[in-house]
Amino acid sequence: MQQFLLIINPLSTAVFFMGLALFAKGRRSFIWIIVIDFLLTFVLFANMVYYRFFSDFITLPNLNPKQMQNMGDMGGSILALIHWTDILFFADVLILIALLVFGIIRPNKESRIRARKVVGVLTLGVAMFFANLGLAEIDRPQLLTRTFDRNYIVKYLGMTNYQIYDAVKSTESQTQKALADSSDVNEVLNYTKSKYAAPNPEYFGKAKGKNVIYIHLESFQQFLINYKLNGEEVTPFINSFFKDQNTLAFTNFFHQTGQGKTADAEMMLENSLYGLSQGSAFTTKGSNTFQSAPGILANYGYDSAVFHGNYKSFWNRDEVYKHFGYNHFFDASYYDMNDNDVSNYGLKDKPFFKESEPYIESLKQPFYAKFITLTNHFPYPIDSDEASIAPATTGDSSVDTYFQTARYLDESVKSFVTYLKETGLYDNSVIVMYGDHYGISDNHASAMTKILGKDYNAYENAQAQRVPFMVHVPGVKGGVKTQYGGEIDVLPTMLHLLGIDTKNYLQMGTDLLSKDHKQLVPFRNGDFISPTYSLIGGKYYNQTTGEPVEKETKEMEATKDTVSKELQLSDSVLQGDLLRFYTPEGFKKVDPSKYNYNKKKSDSEDTTETTK
């Protein structure tokens, strides 16, 4: 059935939209057919290029001006995703143009098809769509009401119909904030309180009063930990951090990002709320009310800062961070962005960490600081003189150089941690290293089969969504932690380590160290992973053996419904800006007007004095 639907699903929109051109006369009608053909083809082409990296399709919020600016900044990455054979997508358009230009087809300028026949063509297109939808519903019931996965919509209904569906859903979401009221937050609060996991006395408050330093490992997947390429460790320093006696190292920790990728990871780590099913909450909901980590910690005397080697407008961070309650944001304007030190998305990691040192020293302790690295980002370009390990030899250039940029990141982090030790910050800080999202998408399955030495199927791809989550707490006995969890669980885990109970906060995640933590990892598309069974691409698998499970049990169905409910409730918080209606006891609302991240002249002078 699915193969048949893949063949017929483009027909309804092709007939309908081409039919619109028939309202025009002769030659003009043919020109409109070419224009419509080009537009439909371009939508398909743009989505294909987007899918090659994001493993997802374009949504209307992706076309938000701020997010489009992000795409513009991605220049080199986009070009790396385009293949010369892609011109074949436009072959039919070129043929139609040639037929018209060279006079092979000469439409009668005055001829016009009768309106009744045109309406008949349009009606046929609509009828074909509903027939398509009916067949799709037979194979996958409630296709348009229950799924979070855009892949299904495209597979069953076609690309253009998906874009229309997405536009309708996006319009609906825009009305939710206006219609929301204080009663809407109660359902969410009831849910989060029902799943609250009480802190583990063994860990609660063990990091109280200490600085918190997050090191964001860009595109870093868990399989890199202890991985050897040609007998050589790819990330020797991060491996040693993973094994440190004071590091809590989680080995079944998954990223849960959607289209927002890094921005989604930040949303979860800072708020314990999922990214949106469409687009990025950073760009579309950046002015919402939040109860984020920096805002919470401000009530306990913490200073806060973000360090990032790209400009503050990227992902709308300058707006979002003010609503999160960050006191400082050191973006690219604070760094020396010379040509030698800039690559891909911004400042290379080594100069980034080095130039961040004087700004760290300007913070009041205790502080909460996040360092967002950039070099280990698709398509993983690196100068030969900066590569200290040979590339892999899969024949896939992005996969091969991934190990070289990961090594560069490893060396950068090592230098930074050495600095923290020399200044005494290391012994008075909780240091967290985490991977934000995958580095290698499932479009590189062939290369990953060679890297991992096993068939990289849907099940293995889901397992590869593990990313590092390592928490180094001075004086606390570390070790490998095997409980299942994800980015949504980071905030309650960290707050409990700092001695702050999360009982009254609206958070979708739970403390990974709590005995009450439920080991269920929802993904943004409605799939999930648990220690016993997992739902991946609409199919169940035995999590231990990787074997498909043919029959859905009541327990599986209940888990699937729980995941769906949790994602919907999280979406309602962001879409309706529901936190404006609820303030936990002891939390002071963030006033975004208090923050200004523009670089002052004194910042330059202070940096110059410090580095002399």
In which residue ranges do the predicted regions lie?
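Solvent-exposed soluble domains appended to multi-pass membrane proteins
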Residues: 192-612
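Membrane-interface segments at or immediately adjacent to transmembrane helices
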Residues: 132-209
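Short coil/turn linker and secondary-structure boundary residues
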Residues: 63-69, 180-183, 485, 507, ...
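Transmembrane and membrane-interface helices of multi-pass
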Residues: 1-167
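Amphipathic, alpha-helical segments enriched in basic
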Residues: 7-17, 21, 28, 32-35, ...
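A diffuse structural propensity rather than consistent per-protein peaks
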Residues: 48-62, 80-83, 178-184, 262, ...
